[in-house]
Amino acid sequence: MAKLYFYYAAMNAGKSTVLLQSSYNYRERGMQTLLFTPAIDTRFQYGTICSRIGLSEQAYAFNNSDNLYVLTQEFQLQTQKYSCVLIDEAQFLTREQVYQLTEITDQMSIPVLAYGLRTDFRGELFPGSQFLLAWADELIELKTICHCGRKAIMNMRIDENGQAVVEGEQVLIGGNESYVATCRLHYKRGEAEVTFPRNKLFNKDTNAF
């Protein structure tokens, strides 16, 4: 029996990487997958799901007015049967679109894997996440860590100086320059340690970085 899965996490937990790996696993076995990504996410090329480690794949960019159930039916008429539907940045789904995902699972018998944030920078649920938490068959937490080493469960919005931002619109598209994943303690303190990873080259002569 097909199920609706919600993979949730804080920022930078590798959600898109896991999504792309899941799609690859299906396609490696000759199965078709259908990928959706919200059009509102303008960080990368339009209609593309990108991971921080460099993986990418084309996807259908949807708007809040799109019916994902109808789109999946229409796309399936143009190709062979889909074995899985995957949704990136699922927190941006509307209540109606989450219901449409349940229809894809229940009426079309296609597994749906949705990946997204659980809460916004205020610690409040996104609409899409709220109804995925309520209606998904399986909930899977993808873990990442705070700068202190504890598990990060909060998404802190920061300004250009790395200071915590506590007011503003719920949706502000951004990456590491705008958000930091932290534990609850450092979120409440408004403390974010903003670091920029340095690429180290491996020296084959010394067998070390």
Swiss-Prot record:
Record-listed ATP binding positions: A9, A10, M11, N12, A13, G14, K15, S16, D88, E89, A90, Q91
GO cellular component: cytosol
Keywords: ATP-binding, Cytoplasm, DNA synthesis, Kinase, Metal-binding, Nucleotide-binding, Transferase, Zinc
Alphabetized GO MF terms: ATP binding; thymidine kinase activity; zinc ion binding
UniProt-listed Pfam families: TK
UniProt-listed PROSITE patterns: TK_CELLULAR_TYPE
Top-level taxon of the source organism: Bacteria
GO annotation, biological process: DNA biosynthetic process; thymidine metabolic process
Subcellular location field: Cytoplasm
Residues annotated as catalytic: E89 (proton acceptor)
Enzyme Commission code: 2.7.1.21
Residues annotated for Zn(2+) binding in this entry: C146, C148, C183, H186
Reaction(s) catalysed (UniProt annotation): thymidine + ATP = dTMP + ADP + H(+)
Family matches, as HAMAP family: Thymidine_kinase (MF_00124)
Subunit and interaction comment: Homotetramer.
Similarity-based family: Belongs to the thymidine kinase family.
Name used for this protein in its record: Thymidine kinase
UniProt organism field: Legionella pneumophila subsp. pneumophila (strain Philadelphia 1 / ATCC 33152 / DSM 7513)
Gene name in the database record: tdk
